[in-house]
């Protein structure tokens, strides 16, 4: 790269680096998963009960000691017939979770640094670990201010979450008279969550944004001039306790009546739901031993440090700068409460089991919207006709044929609390104000309010049929659907330059527009007893979808999203396009020589080996910031998804496998850093090195280049076929088990996520995102794990 730009060779003796560091190979490891379950049940004519439990342990595939998940569950079900008409049922589940985490995905994660760190840098620096480096090599500033040694980050990461959760249900049903029943059901969930995190004194190299300490020219900690110790810029301890309580109380009346061949049922009900949250947060600077075992709030204090920092000005003169660090312990609380009130009714009718009709309406009120928009009405109707019950239908090969259709509207309010009202937030770095020479904590504006927020609605029309053939061995189900989402709830990714993300704020939630999905769902299943000992069952599911944005509720007609490089976006929610469509520059190969550059439309800064961009509007100039030269580059929504399963049983042996395929979805490589000495994708091994060497991958360069503008060069076909599961089991014959008083013993081996066939160069072609307008943008997504399981099921 340096030679290509006319510079000196940076590493004359590259053999001195040995084999280098394969960061990804060093980071990933095999991790065990263990799962133990038990269950017991019993009862009498009036009482039934069951108890079950499980112990689950899983270690992370990166740094198992810092990334793991442990869960214990206990479950109990109880049913009692109090009288002939009054019945009681209860359910109680206790869950205990202990989880440790590292930064797992996206920018700032261990994996992101592992993908981009130079292979010329070793993991360790050869020191005893007592100095600022803690024994880990520095990643040079030439690799950017944010790229750090991923193993150093792991060493300095301490996050622990402990959860105790109780989930339960109590239900009473009473048969008032024949055909009339009243049911009242109370569901509850309570969770107590305790988080503790620790940011130790850490130095990752010159000018790194993650540094919590500074060092002098001798690579030693800079200390307080008053003798107070090492200057701590922002390390510390955070602890918080969060309580979640939610309940739902439903009461409904159900009336059923049959006369002649008519069957009627009516249901009327009401539902009250509440979700409450209360959190207490604290943060402070640790004193005493700098360790995880000492990292508790009671070991923190306010700090005030003074130190001298020397540096060189552009002329080489020494500049002495007196610095002060003052940080007080902070505490804050958070309170959320959401409430819902619903009324609903349903009527169902069928005649002789042949003609089916159902209608339902809900009225839902939610405090997640302002007073003028809290209530939504959501009706639905459906109908069906079972032709095989008609006297005129007499086809031996067709055992069941039902045609059906439905229309309905549902509502969505999953946007969090208080999006419609402005709030203040405090006790954070953004909410500090200077009074004289002292910085004081206060409050700052939180997420911007949108008082006009309203329900997102999903209107769906379905037409389909269900059919069974050849003595019910062959089943086919097909649906054609049109789903229209109006007032789509979305948080736009707004640039901080616009001010909405400054000072601790965030972009408001908006009703962004209208999208439409239409497609086909097809399910085909076949089962057959091939012989007395051999049984086969297989199935195929196919789903197609065409997504289109019908309306965007702003003047521009689009909302940008997705992260790429520095300040660039990848995707758009734009009228006429699928949601999350990738939008950028189109490419037309690589400039092979100066003559090609001269013959092409004017492209600023172009050199042989650079990407040749398409002049979209044909005006003779490729304008990098112009709408006219941008185009649709793909979208993350698959044209088709397929699922396949196969089950075989032969005597005591059983075999099962399932496959999943996604066809037509694209993804963006947005996990690369375009810096001189950072790691590069393997595709750069086939880069342009001279005329005729490559027409797909540009030259390597240390200088600023337009090759790193977002274009279709970074968009890949992410279609894939995944072997999701393969399992082989053996059940010991019952004749053998009778001798040892057992009902069933099955031993099995299984593999999950066995292999993925794909051309995508990232870890996982199935790139997800909570924001649908930024789906398919791979920021360094954590890979799916492959698991191998050996298990045994025992029943007494």
Cite the ranges covered by each PLM segment.
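Conserved small-residue
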Residues: 1-14, 104, 277-289, 510, ...
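Residues embedded in well-ordered regular secondary structure
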Residues: 1-66, 153-155, 173-175, 324, ...
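Surface-exposed loop/turn segments flanking beta-strands in extracellular/periplasmic regions
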Residues: 2-18, 109-148, 201-228, 278-329, ...
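Extracytoplasmic gating/loop element in the C-terminal half of outer-membrane beta-barrel translocons
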Residues: 11, 151, 205-207, 214-219, ...
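Transmembrane beta-barrel wall of Gram-negative outer-membrane proteins
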Residues: 25-102, 113, 166-169
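Outer-membrane beta-barrel transmembrane strands
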Residues: 29-48, 54, 150-197, 236-259, ...
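Short loop/turn motifs that connect adjacent beta-strands in outer-membrane beta-barrel proteins
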Residues: 45-46, 85, 179, 258-264, ...
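Small-side-chain secondary-structure face that scaffolds active or pore-lining regions
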Residues: 61-71, 81, 93-95, 101-106, ...
